[in-house]
Amino acid sequence: CALMILFAGSVVFIDNATATLVLGLLGALSGVALAFVTGHGYLISSKPTWNTKKLPLAYTGTAAVAGGFLYVAIAAFAGADPAIVRALCWILLGCVAFSAVFSVAWLRHLGADRVRQNLDLCRWGIVVCGLVIPVAAAVALAIMPINAFFGVVAGFGLVAALAGGIALRVLMWVVGAGFLFFFEEAQANRSAILNV
């Protein structure tokens, strides 16, 4: 967060493209690393739906897309150098492609039955909000002129990417935490389970 605030401050208050670029790259790289580490923390061999390297890569992809849209939106609204904004758009396209590959790979890891059981979440949350809208918005940003509407498209892409990332995480918990009701059952029937 601190690097993001410094980046935004450098765009608005400091007229130094190098400082802005360095702060932006540091913030982006630390965000990507933290997203991967968070996703990797869920690799648990007793939960087959979580025990795959595709999960932290999908986490990383969705976080990178949301972060990419945020950087593009801030740069556009702050009136950053158009060359930097264009470079961010191309980086964003790479993030969107990465996210699409690993989100779909993780959905395939879950299998068709689990996806069908959670069809609305997968269809509207992950596919539409997390993949289709970000892809369309990123392509539009890469080819459209930088104007007031540019920032609106970046903001719309950001909101959709956040919704898609949240949907992926919700699905992770829905398919991976099915055993949690056993704790409630044990609490309700404590004497029968513990023979007391």
Where are these regions (language model features)?
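Long, contiguous internal "core" modules enriched in hydrophobic/ aromatic residues
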Residues: L3-P145, F150-G151, G157, A161-A167
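Extramembrane terminal tails and long inter-domain/linker segments of multi-pass membrane proteins
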Residues: M172-V196
